[in-house]
Structures are given as C-alpha cells and as structure tokens.
Amino acid sequence: AIVGRPRF
C-alpha cells in the first residue's frame, strides 16, 4: 500500500 492512495 502507498500512503496517499486508496488501499489496493
């Protein structure tokens, strides 16, 4: 997961 993006 990348902080600043929705959980994918």
From Swiss-Prot:
GO terms for cellular component: extracellular region. The modification Phenylalanine amide is found at residue 8. The keyword Transmembrane helix does not apply. One of its GO terms (molecular function) is toxin activity. The amidation of Phe-8 is essential for rat ASIC3 current potentiation. A synthetic peptide with Phe-8 not amidated does not potentiate ASIC3 current. Transmembrane segments: none annotated. Expressed by the venom duct. Belongs to the NPY family. CNF-Tx1.3: Potentiates ASIC3 (homotrimer) currents and heterotrimer-containing ASIC3. Is less potent than CNF-Tx1.1 and CNF-Tx1.2. In addition, it slows the desensitization kinetics of ASIC3. In vivo, intramuscular injection into mice enhances acid-induced muscle pain. This is Conorfamide Tx1.3. It comes from Conus textile (Cloth-of-gold cone).
